[in-house]
Amino acid sequence: VERAGLEDLFQGKQAGYEKITFFGPTNLSILRWMIEQGYNAVREIPEATCRELILRHIVAGIHWRDDIPRGEQVLGETQGKGGEVFTSAFGTKFWVYSFQDTYHDIPDVGPVYLYVTSFDTRTQIDVASTDIETDNGVVHSLNYSYTFGQL
């Protein structure tokens, strides 16, 4: 965040982004990307690259897990049925949908999951943990299997 010069954004001091939703990659996801790209330290990554990658994970406003409409994948399609399309702070688009599992074969009472699909990479990403409240928004933590740059 510091390398990208985005401290004000994460503190709610940027116009239009006073409240944000951050689809947050794990440290492992970032480290995996760095190794794949040949970087040994964050300071080696160009500032513009850091900025783009982080902005791809941010949308304006607070979007709690329960605000995301139910949806479902459609085989061979990037965007399935339902859900919601978001535009990131970088301008890229991704589709997010929720899915509620059954509990002992009873519908609509099981756990609720979030999934994200990038229109750029056509990658589906599982959200590991939702609704992590921050001072100016909410974080939905992406699964460890996510590699930074796939969103």
Identify the residue ranges that each predicted region occupies.
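Mature, structured domains of secreted/extracytosolic soluble proteins
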Residues: 1-151
